[in-house]
């Protein structure tokens, strides 16, 4: 069902079962597939392909040659019904690829709100992205990767399957990420290593000086004092009272499964 108020170029192909919101613009030669739902005020450039089942919210911008909601590249995928869910006000630049989930996980790839995916970014099956994330050109997320809010990933970086990146973490360009990166950390390298606390980013985001100081102390405990991970957990746990930001870090390292970048 297509609402008349949408502006659809005559060369675009929109499936009869697609649901198009108000004030949506769809450019030339774009293909909108079956079971695709596009929210209000979205802008879709020429030569975009969106395949369903995909649901996106309002205010998203998708640039030319992006492929959104395609089948995943997991060799175990056998045509099962899987999904892609996208929130509001995201930007997908040229040639981005975002794949639907797999039956082996939750079946759904999820992207939150206000994210910027620059040119040639790849988001694989079953990834979960929060809000206010920046993925620079050619950043690649393997399957089942999870990014918390306010993460920044530099260009040409690649994240291994099942890795997690905590909130406000920053990854330098050309990095190979094979372990979890805790909240607030900066990390870079091949393979990636911790490089300190993202102090500038935290200040810009309104973190107070006390919280940043406690995060830096926790970083030293984890990465610079020679503690085992279990020893570091015990020492950080002793400092949690009155610092919710530190609680976020502590909870993250307690849930690690691939190891922590240190």
From Swiss-Prot:
Pathway: Glycolipid biosynthesis; lipid IV(A) biosynthesis; lipid IV(A) from (3R)-3-hydroxytetradecanoyl-[acyl-carrier-protein] and UDP-N-acetyl-alpha-D-glucosamine: step 1/6. Pfam families: Acetyltransf_11, Hexapep. It is an enzyme of class 2 (transferase). It is found in: Cytoplasm. Belongs to the transferase hexapeptide repeat family. LpxA subfamily. Homotrimer. This is Acyl-[acyl-carrier-protein]--UDP-N-acetylglucosamine O-acyltransferase. It comes from Psychromonas ingrahamii (strain DSM 17664 / CCUG 51855 / 37). The gene is lpxA.
